[in-house]
Curated annotation (Swiss-Prot):
One Gene Ontology CC term in the entry: nuclear body
Residue ranges of domain Myb-like in the record: 44-129
One Pfam family hit: Myb_DNA-bind_4
Annotated region (Disordered), positions in chain: 1-27, 138-168
Classification lineage: Eukaryota, Metazoa, Chordata, Craniata, Vertebrata
InterPro entries: Myb/SANT-like_DNA-bd_dom_prot, Myb_DNA-bind_4
Classification via Gene3D superfamilies: Homeodomain-like
Species in which this protein is naturally found: Homo sapiens
One GO term of the biological process aspect: positive regulation of DNA-templated transcription
Protein name as catalogued: Myb/SANT-like DNA-binding domain-containing protein 1
Record gene name: MSANTD1
């Protein structure tokens, strides 16, 4: 019995898709993925070559990133530049998240490192330090001291035009963010850095307390052993004293018996002498 052909798609239709969607899928490049699938897929780990390229691209587009808060197009240009350098394709959002995470890691290490000590062994610490050293440390929103104040109209024109590299007109990067939606995240990260610093300062105190507690326990055990040894010596001395008293008592008894024998001998001699004289 042969089944009749159903209304479902034929094998040729499955193997050779037709229509606008099929043609688009066939003509489109293999690396293009839908935004939903791209958003939910697992991000690949960054290789060492990608990280070195990212440092160079970040330094190249650093001034351009500071000119505006809405810099998605700048990140896309950075992604294209990184693709030209390494041959690896990354989204602008991936580069944005990676730069944010690396900036947080750099600030955490800088907070935990003294100015006189050697820099951390993180391989990208010095490179990020050189990139972020381009901006001043203050974040009060004022212009640098080298920029003289002018009329309000000139200030408006200067704010609209791209700033020159010699006199940058952007907010400092260390504290004032160029991404408005990450302000709350940075405040949380700064509080976490402070708590981390306080924890690192509390650790030596706790360590000293534990060491002093162990030392006190050792001293207590030593004192208990010394007291027990003293008691044992006291018992031995008491036993020796009792033995000495017993020996002295026996010696006294022997001396008394010896005196009695001497008296008896003297009395016998006197009797013998009296008998011989008679």
């Amino acid at each position: 019995m042969v089944r009749g052909a159903g209304p479902g798609p034929s094998l040729s239709a499955l193997s050779h898709p037709t229509g606008a969607s099929g043609m688009a899928a066939a003509e489109g490049p293999g690396y293009l993925v839908s935004p939903q699938a791209e958003k939910h897929r697992r991000a690949r780990n960054w290789t060492d070559a990608e990280m070195r390229g990212l440092m160079l691209v970040w330094e190249e587009f650093f001034d351009e990133l500071k000119q505006t808060k809405r810099n998605a197009k700048v990140y896309e240009k950075m992604a294209s530049k990184l693709f030209e350098m390494t041959g690896e394709r990354r989204l602008g959002e991936e580069i944005k998240i990676k730069i944010t995470n690396m900036t947080f890691q750099y600030r955490k290490l800088k907070c935990m490192t003294d100015s006189e000590s050697a820099p951390p062994d993180w391989p990208y610490y010095l490179a990020i330090d050189g990139i972020l050293a381009k901006v001043p440390e203050s974040c009060d929103g004022k212009l640098p001291d080298s920029q003289p104040p002018g009329p309000s109209t000139s200030q408006t024109e200067a704010s609209l035009s791209p700033p020159a590299k010699s006199t940058p007109l952007y907010f400092p990067y260390n504290q004032c963010s160029y991404e408005g939606r990450f302000e709350d995240d940075r405040s949380d990260s700064s509080s976490s850095l402070l708590s981390l610093k306080f924890r690192s300062e509390e650790r030596p105190v706790k360590k000293r307390k534990v060491q002093s507690c162990h030392l006190q326990k050792k001293q207590l055990r030593l004192l208990e052993a010394m007291v027990e040894e003293q008691r044992r010596l006291s018992r031995a001395v008491e036993e020796t004293c009792r033995e000495v008293r017993r020996v002295l008592d026996q010696q006294h008894i022997l001396q008394v018996q010896s005196l009695q024998l001497q008296e008896r001998m003297m009395s016998l001699l006197e009797r013998i002498i009296t008998k011989s004289s008679v």
